[in-house]
Amino acid sequence: MSTHLEADVVIVGSGVAGALVAWRLAEAKLNVLILEAGPRIDRLEAFKSYVAAREKNFNAPYPPVPHAPTARLNAWNDYYINTGPNLFRGTYTRAVGGSTWHWAGSALRYRPNDFRMKSSFGVGIDWPLGYDELAPFYDEAERALGVAGSKTEDWGAPRQSDYPIPPIPPTYLDRVVGDVLGPLGMSLAVFPQARNSVDYDERPQCCGSASCVPLCPIGAKYDASVHVLKAERAGARLEPNAVVHRIETDANHRISMVHFLRPDGSTGSAAGRIVVLAANAIETPKLLLMSRDERTSKGVANSSSSVGHYLMGQIDQGTRGLTKAPIYPYRGPVLTSAIREFRDGPFRSKHSGIGTSLSNEGWGHARGPQATALKLIDQALRGKPLQDAIAWVTERQLVVGSTAEPLPDSANRIVPDDTKHDAIGIPRPRIHYRIDDYAKAGLTLAMRRHEAIFSALQATEVETFPMVTSSGTVLGTTRMGDDRRQSVVDRDLRAHDHSNLFIVGGMVFPTAGVNPPTLTIAALALRASAQIKQDLAQMP
């Protein structure tokens, strides 16, 4: 059985980028179709899955979806085929709302220098647009997501408007750690975050569950299902469980159709005057490269041979310890404050900028209260002594984490592996990734700062974790640029090769930065929406 669907705009993917584009275009009374590979998520059922799960990791609320698989914690190669010197751990959720279901909610803008790495520091590459051009869309994105913050906190990105809602207050943990930072040449500031400090946009105020990763149980933290629903209310049509596997072009180099599979074995196709790919930085290049035919021998949108290259994941490293005095983690959102310094400066010509933040979730899922209890039980503690010992340890648990930016490297790439397929016969992604010396040098300096912080807190049981690619960021692979010989999309996110194809999401980033990328993804999507409306208005 096969179905054929038509719309003004066909959007593949319903994460934050696809959802915002769908919302903006549906509000403009355009006929919008959203094709999402995964299912809808019911928040209550997800919460029940999390409670019932033995391991409380970020996969716990979201059972595997055989027809739309992803890499999962501690089982990265069940889907990815990693072939490089470093394990690529960037993951995502294939479901309505995408990975924003389990993001931390941190919503910083990129800094002006993040858009001009080559011009400012002689490394990487410049973006085809600058901060000033994106600033109005940052304002719009903050209103759309409901970003809580304070204009008085300087995060290095000039702004004219205030945040739409007041900042999330710092935790007691933030205040204790912040008190020791001054003599170390550091200062703490409250993060802007897409989490309600007050009721906003029909969503409740944060109640401090400390479970933002993997799930906000009440919907106070923004996730993209918010704008999928708004798009549907404005007339958009959502087709969940529709796995797009091929893009078809016509003789005029326009996208004529996309083809999809369903888990029941049925097939479908969809045609739109404009097609928008918003399926993240792994699935999007995989789809483009799988769509080779006699007209596009290297794949769709790939005349530059750049599709799949320049894969980036921010690089993480953390330190844990037990502070001398109680700091009472496990209260409030998972992250509320971060260190201002070391994110930008002339040093970026030699090593990465560093984003350092404090975690409010103790030692996390693997080493938190449950693991502490098991360890103490093995030491023959029972009853009140066991209870007191668990409390003593958990109220002192601290993790400080730092993030480094890699430089874009053509050798870091993703391709479809034609020899290994998923449950419905689609090639799995084969990934080559290497952590570069630029990021390593930045994190080496960051670990010295971690040591100083834990020393000032008179901490014990201090341990530094290995350097790893972030599980929360997947960037590059269809990067934007003015030169069509070295990029896939232009400054408006329109494919150089196909006038009616737009690509939105982190895959268009030329460089990674150290700030969380979600707000920049949102701003770029809103900017592209305006261009799509203009293009449609000019079409016959």
Predicted regions and their residues:
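Conserved N-terminal glycine-rich FAD pyrophosphate-binding loop of Rossmann-like flavoproteins
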Residues: 39-65, 93-102
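Glycine-rich loop(s) and the adjacent beta-strand/alpha-helix scaffold that form part
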Residues: 27, 31-53, 233, 242, ...
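N-terminal Rossmann-like FAD-binding beta1-loop-alpha1 element of flavoenzymes
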Residues: 9-34
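A glycine-rich dinucleotide-binding beta-alpha-beta segment and adjacent secondary-structure elements
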Residues: 76, 189-215, 219, 245-248, ...
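A short, basic/flexible loop-to-alpha-helix module at the beginning of a structural domain
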Residues: 1-6
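Conserved redox-cofactor binding core of oxidoreductases
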Residues: 58-73, 79-85, 94, 109, ...
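FAD cofactor-binding and catalytic pocket of flavoenzymes
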Residues: 76-92, 96-99, 103, 127-131, ...
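A conserved FAD-binding loop/helix module that cradles the flavin
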Residues: 511-530
